[in-house]
Amino acid sequence: MKLKETLNLGQTAFPMRAGLPNKEPQWQEAWDQADIYKKRQALNEGKPAFHLHDGPPYANGNIHVGHALNKISKDIIVRSKSMSGFRAPYVPGWDTHGLPIEQVLAKKGVKRKEMDLAEYLEMCRDYALSQVDKQRDDFKRLGVSADWENPYITLTPDYEADQVRVFGAMADKGYIYRGAKPVYWSWSSESALAEAEIEYHDIDSTSLYYANKVKDGKGILDTDTYIVVWTTTPFTVTASRGLTVGPDMEYVVVVPVGSERKYLLAEVLVDSLAAKFGWENFEIVTHHTGKELNHIVTEHPWDTEVEELVILGDHVTTDSGTGIVHTAPGFGEDDYNVGIANGLDVVVTVDSRGLMMENAGPDFEGQFYDKVTPLVKEKLGDLLLASEVINHSYPFDWRTKKPIIWRAVPQWFASVSKFRQEILDEIEKTNFQPEWGKKRLYNMIRDRGDWVISRQRAWGVPLPIFYAEDGTAIMTKEVTDHVADLFAEYGSIVWWQRDAKDLLPAGYTHPGSPNGLFEKETDIMDVWFDSGSSWNGVMNARENLSYPADLYLEGSDQYRGWFNSSLITSVAVNGHAPYKAVLSQGFVLDGKGEKMSKSLGNTILPSDVEKQFGAEILRLWVTSVDSSNDVRISMDILKQTSETYRKIRNTLRFLIANTSDFNPKQDAVAYENLGAVDRYMTIKFNQVVDTINKAYAAYDFMAIYKAVVNFVTVDLSAFYLDFAKDVVYIEAANSPERRRMQTVFYDILVKLTKLLTPILPHTAEEIWSYLEHEEEEFVQLAEMPVAQTFSGQEEILEEWSAFMTLRTQAQKALEEARNAKVIGKSLEAHLTIYASQEVKTLLTALNSDIALLMIVSQLTIADEADKPADSVSFEGVAFTVEHAEGEVCERSRRIDPTTKMRSYGVAVCDASAAIIEQYYPEAVAQGFEA
């Protein structure tokens, strides 16, 4: 035999190269076949519940890396809870109604208005379900464990019915009303939009400064006075019915030199505006407060028969403009509020497609609203004082990426104002992570208007409202409950398939319909009402779930989206929030911190990562970043993550290989019988177990990542395993020293594998398949380890911390000797430590082979007073390094004075010779092969 065969060189088939792109699908198939999700749920039956409610992604297209961050985060939380004594079912969901699907069909050539509505809606449904299947496969490829067979989908009949019941409950409490308030109007979608459907972009717009002539100055202003107005939306001048001034602002009337006109404008802006208007000199003739100007009458700039009333408004500022804003109640929220309060007419001159209407005047009719600025300037004539291009933030339809307008049209609203304080009180009771989320959502609810819930589209849940002959809206509990029952049985498509009377309860009558005739609403609900009702359609509806949920986890954009709409509906119906805690995440940016976009070519798809690295690397990346803020990802970042994964994997592979002959039931050594350094590592590892368990409970993935990486690279690879291999390789297979270390190896291997399972389930399962002494078939069916504490552990940790400092100093001395060519490898060294009594006491207390721990062949501890002049000192401790005496033992690779050529043909030290002669007599008799 060969000499190396006398060494216990750990053997394992566990591969160094992970091959994740190929292996992960195999593991996922094995989990499906074994029905792991259901088995885990069955194991947890009767345990305390933890319910994370899945915010539904929109079912359109493959998932992006933001989806991956979110879904992996949820999976880590649910897996860790499931392995930590909680019944934690996870029901995934999809949002399936809305404009994007209509747009996809339109791009495919489907013409909605030229076909039967029921047929069109069926096409929408089929497409949505195809996208659900696509995304389900994408999420499963990430290794996400969920009830994939029973997801919630917002287009299913039972869900639609529960959504209608939420609406009915809100209507029954008087929270639903119809109004003609200005709403965000998307001409590109031909529909109203909610605030959550708006995004802002910087654009260039033409702003106009023009003047309205005073018609009735109320004894305050002369009729030859003109009030100077500013607008950034010239098309709205066609619907202007008032001029708003700040009640406490100071205004002046000025006369430019050479002009026959007087102009009123804010006093603080006179100089800047005079320069803008080309007034070289002017005279201030009178001063006025805004309150003094109230109810002065002016003429519309070109339609002089239309009067525009001066009114007061707190929204007027002097940050820009003239201190006076023209007021078109049909085209703005502030305009509407002050206009209604002062009896102004609400005029809308733009239709649903963005085209100017007949009431705008014959010159404007039929033109696109954004193209009429030249005509407005022409109509203003000499009343136009200046025109300039400004760059400002403007709202866009987040789906079509087209600008929107404010437009007053009859819509259905949910009144937030009626129960706003209840919502705010519930926010105060909710836990937020990060903490700033509480203030963000609080301020949003505090400042938001009522919620426009109607949409002028086809693909969605119909508003369950009927109209009597006299126009009375009917949405009583009796009616909405009946509609909900119909939806539960037939789906919401029944709304379009039946006449109004056939949708009402049998024999239904209403005093407003003496002839028994009814009409039904044709608008659908805002999709945020769909997803915002999920607490009722899912958490409150399924027996294995509970409401309110323990946790909602989504991107920070959902403060104005799902967090917001769910909170409103839940408080409206039941008086409490739908969640106990909210965790939000930032956006995923590219490696340079830029937003990802196809046009920039900087997008990274999960499928790309899976093909190149494997989903495990994406999962590990999720734990390596602070996702409460925006995070960065790139292929270079993922390469670094892959390198970290490799270190973790290879360390665990070493532990597998070097416990392959270890049976924990027969060979394990009790803690009190372990060596001193083994006890230290056991204590140290249990601290890591405690840190990781607490971090899982706090959803602090980064803390887990840091704890694992630090323990694997510093405590294990750079310390314990670095010298332990000299014991497990060299000592006799059954020696107490080797079994002590194998006990620690195996304990770390099993427990660390469990701890890593929520993050790296594929790798953990692969490792588990090599642990033949563990009972559970799959590691996902095991329980998380519980951290142990040991008597005197604080003192032990303190002693070893001091030793680790000494070891670092010794390594510096060895490095200097290496550089000076005194030694090559550290095993060639004889290290002398000139120790104080304190250091001697420490080394004695450790009760360990210090030479082994220092990875030197020979070590001497001398008195501090005896240090020679050529010693080197680090932090008060002196060292000398000499070449060790003796020859290299061919078996242990240590230099030992007892090393000599043996009769069986190898030069080994006495310790190795004793092992060879006891355990390998045949080799002793025959000699070793060269």
From Swiss-Prot:
Q: Which EC numbers characterise this protein's activity in its record?
A: 6.1.1.5
UniProt keyword Lipid metabolism present = no
Residues reported in the UniProt entry to bind L-isoleucyl-5'-AMP? 554
Sorted alphabetically, which Pfam families does this protein's record hold?
Anticodon_1, tRNA-synt_1
Q: Where is the short sequence motif 'KMSKS' region located?
A: 595-599
Which residues participate in ATP binding?
598
What UniProt keywords apply to this chain's record, in alphabetical order?
Aminoacyl-tRNA synthetase, ATP-binding, Cytoplasm, Ligase, Nucleotide-binding, Protein biosynthesis
Q: Which stretch carries the motif 'HIGH' region?
A: 57-67
Instruction: Name where it mostly resides.
Output: cytoplasm
Which reaction(s) does the protein catalyse, per the Swiss-Prot or TrEMBL entry? tRNA(Ile) + L-isoleucine + ATP = L-isoleucyl-tRNA(Ile) + AMP + diphosphate
> GO molecular function: any one?
tRNA binding
The record's InterPro entries line, in alphabetical order, gives: aa-tRNA-synth_I_CS, aa-tRNA-synth_Ia, Anticodon_Ile_BEm, Ile-tRNA-ligase, Ile-tRNA-ligase_type1, Ile-tRNA_ligase, M/V/L/I-tRNA-synth_anticd-bd, Rossmann-like_a/b/a_fold
State where the protein is found: Cytoplasm
List GO terms (cellular component aspect). Answer: cytosol
Q: From its record, what is one biological process in GO terms?
A: isoleucyl-tRNA aminoacylation
Superkingdom as given in the UniProt entry: Bacteria
In the UniProt record, does the keyword Nucleus occur?
no
UniProt subunit comment: Monomer.
Domain remark in the UniProt entry: IleRS has two distinct active sites: one for aminoacylation and one for editing. The misactivated valine is translocated from the active site to the editing site, which sterically excludes the correctly activated isoleucine. The single editing site contains two valyl binding pockets, one specific for each substrate (Val-AMP or Val-tRNA(Ile)).
NCBIfam families recorded for this chain?
ileS
Q: What role is this protein assigned?
A: Catalyzes the attachment of isoleucine to tRNA(Ile). As IleRS can inadvertently accommodate and process structurally similar amino acids such as valine, to avoid such errors it has two additional distinct tRNA(Ile)-dependent editing activities. One activity is designated as 'pretransfer' editing and involves the hydrolysis of activated Val-AMP. The other activity is designated 'posttransfer' editing and involves deacylation of mischarged Val-tRNA(Ile).
* Entry's family note: Belongs to the class-I aminoacyl-tRNA synthetase family. IleS type 1 subfamily.
Q: What's the protein called, per UniProt?
A: Isoleucine--tRNA ligase
| Organism per entry | Streptococcus agalactiae serotype V (strain ATCC BAA-611 / 2603 V/R)
